[in-house]
C-alpha cells in the first residue's frame, strides 16, 4: 500500500487578507449546479489521465502538500488556456525546502500564497489571492467557476487515507491533529472534487463543512485582462491590494 503524507500547518490569520465576498457584485450570476474544470483541461491537452497531469510531487515521503497543491493549481490554470505545464517533482521539492529552510516541517497556506504573489513559480506570479468562507458554498462554487479552482486546507479525519485508498469519497469523522492542502477543481450537489496524492478525490459536502478550515481563490496573471471575471470587482481588488502592500 502506498504511503501518503500531510503537512499543512494550522490556518494562519492575517487581518490584511482580502476576502472574496467583498468583490462579488450583483452582476455575478449564481454558479451552475455542477462543474468540472478538468473537463476543459482534458479537452485542451488531449488527455484525461490525472495521474500524469497531477503527480504526487513528493507528497508520499515529504509533508509538502501545500506545494503540491500549488503545482496542481498551475497545471489546471495553464491547461485551461491550452498549455501543458507540469512542475517536476524536483522543482516542487526544491521550492518546498526553500520555504521551510531545508527541513521537512510542512508549511502554512498563507506563507505559500504570499511567496507566490511575490515570486514567480513556474514562470508566473499570481496577481492576488482572496479568502473564501468555506461555509458559504455559493462563494466556493463561484470561485471555482471564475478562477478554475480553490486552494484549500482541511483538518484530516481518521478515515481520510482509508477512503482515499479504497477510492471512496471522503466523509466526516473524528479528526486527527494533521492538516492537508489540496486543490478543488469541481463540484456537484453531493461532492466537492479535489486533486491530491497524484489523483482525483471526491469529498462529501458534509466532509467539507466538518473538515475544511481555509479556502482561497487564486487570481492568475490573466485576471488583469478586461472581462476576465465578469461580476467580480477586480479593479477594486487591485486598489485594495495596493493599499495592503503599502
What are the functions of these language-model segments?
Residues 1-246:
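Catalytic-core signature of thiol
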Amino acid at each position: 500500500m502506498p504511503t501518503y503524507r500531510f503537512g499543512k500547518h494550522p490556518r494562519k490569520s492575517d487581518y490584511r487578507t482580502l476576502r472574496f465576498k467583498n468583490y462579488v457584485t450583483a452582476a455575478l450570476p449564481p454558479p451552475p449546479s455542477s462543474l468540472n474544470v478538468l473537463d476543459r483541461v482534458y479537452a485542451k491537452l488531449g488527455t484525461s489521465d490525472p495521474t500524469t497531469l497531477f503527480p504526487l510531487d513528493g507528497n508520499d515521503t515529504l509533508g509538502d502538500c501545500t506545494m503540491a497543491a500549488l503545482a496542481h493549481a498551475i497545471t489546471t490554470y495553464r491547461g485551461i488556456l491550452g498549455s501543458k505545464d507540469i512542475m517536476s517533482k524536483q522543482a516542487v521539492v526544491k521550492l518546498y525546502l526553500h520555504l521551510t529552510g531545508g527541513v521537512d516541517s510542512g508549511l502554512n497556506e498563507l506563507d505559500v500564497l504570499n511567496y507566490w504573489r511575490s515570486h514567480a513559480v513556474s514562470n508566473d506570479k499570481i496577481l492576488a489571492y482572496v479568502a473564501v468562507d468555506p461555509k458559504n458554498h455559493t462563494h466556493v462554487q463561484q470561485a471555482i467557476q471564475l478562477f478554475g479552482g480553490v486552494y484549500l486546507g482541511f483538518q484530516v479525519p481518521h478515515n481520510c487515507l482509508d477512503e482515499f485508498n479504497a477510492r471512496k469519497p471522503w466523509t466526516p469523522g473524528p479528526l486527527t491533529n494533521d492538516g492537508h492542502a489540496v486543490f478543488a477543481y469541481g463540484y456537484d450537489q453531493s461532492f466537492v472534487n479535489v486533486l491530491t496524492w497524484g489523483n482525483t478525490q471526491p469529498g462529501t459536502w458534509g466532509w467539507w463543512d466538518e473538515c475544511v478550515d481555509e479556502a482561497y481563490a487564486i487570481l492568475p496573471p490573466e485576471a488583469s485582462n478586461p472581462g476576465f471575471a465578469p461580476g467580480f470587482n477586480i479593479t477594486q481588488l487591485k486598489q485594495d491590494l495596493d493599499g495592503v502592500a503599502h
